[in-house]
């Protein structure tokens, strides 16, 4: 959502694995609270990711926040990471008070537009991929934040720019990792808002699960994906909603 204080919406599937039916949303369930840090900034967007970051068998939440410091001009753009640990169970989640920039993650200059999580180097822990936008010249950089810790005790490095064959300047910002072609490695899918449509980009991992290599430019609107009459930055999530495997 926009801003630091909007919170979470949750819609339970009250149907089943093959015929999903989602209930009306509830706000801030499971002990979740909006985060209001004592920072001289206005939060613009939070992108939430559900992942078992501490390898204890339940889903935690890591949020990437884009913010602008309006305390002085020219305004400074920063990115933060907010962590909500699930201290409950997989079936009865309960989230702790959120904390800022855990696991070696730190406030970064410019803006990390969006990050996604996955074991990109095949070493058994969760890494990050994303894009950074420099608002001084609107240049984009592809970034990799490696987990040099473990699956249960993550520790993230500083961002590495333009690795795995992805150059700067790719005009797709909302990114997700998925083995879309089921060949055993993680590929990249993007979405990008245009004037009157939203495009989807696919960049295949032509390397391996351990040594990824991507070959841009993206294939646009592959696999029948298209939103020709809808404008917006859709965040891609891959789930088997109809239970067909």
Q: What does each model-found stretch correspond to?
A:
Residues 1-3, 61-65, 128-133, 188-192:
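Hydrophobic beta-strand segments that make up the repeating blades of beta-propeller
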Residues 4-5, 66-72, 133-138, 193-197:
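Short glycine/acidic-enriched loop and turn motifs that connect beta-strands
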Residues 5, 43-45, 78, 112, ...:
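Short coil/loop residues immediately preceding or within conserved phosphate-binding loops
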Residues 7-10, 80-82, 141-144, 199-203:
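A short loop-to-beta-strand structural motif that recurs across blades of beta-propeller domains
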Residues 12-42, 85-110, 146-170, 204-231:
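Blade-edge motifs of beta-propeller repeat domains
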Residues 14-15, 52-58, 87, 118-121, ...:
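Calcium-coordinating acidic loop motifs
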Residues 41-46, 64, 68, 77, ...:
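Beta-propeller domains
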Residues 46-53, 64, 113-120, 173-180, ...:
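Beta-propeller blade termini
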